[in-house]
């Protein structure tokens, strides 16, 4: 959000395909990098949405995949992370344990 939802400025993998989408599309959901063990990879994952649930608190948020990662999970934008870290344990531990499901973005 601090970069006006600019995928090129963020240097994310999906910028090649999604940087020229309307601001309303780019800003509809917080962003995540996706490298989960189940689901599409590479360009096929770009623009897809996930419903992410903090397993410790049940807090949920929908995010849009804009990047890749290599940690075997998700790399949530800090604002998204903070939104579902409702008890502060994720910040204290440096990570959250989450479940995710692919959902319709409603675009």
From Swiss-Prot:
Q: Which domain of life is it from?
A: Eukaryota
Keyword line: Cell wall, Disulfide bond, Pathogenesis-related protein, Plant defense, Secreted
Where does the record say this protein resides? Secreted, Cell wall
**GO biological process annotation, one example:** defense response to fungus
Every copy of the Barwin domain together lies at: 1-107
GO cellular component annotations of the record: extracellular region
What Pfam families does the database record attribute to this sequence?
A: Barwin
Provide any one GO MF term from the record: RNA nuclease activity
The record's InterPro entries line, in alphabetical order, gives: Barwin_CS, Barwin_dom, PR4, RlpA-like_sf
Q: Has keyword Phosphoprotein?
A: no
PANTHER family of this UniProt entry?
A: HEVEIN-LIKE PREPROPROTEIN (PTHR46351:SF7), WOUND-INDUCED PROTEIN WIN2 (PTHR46351)
Query: What is the protein name given in its UniProt record?
Result: Pathogenesis-related protein PR-4
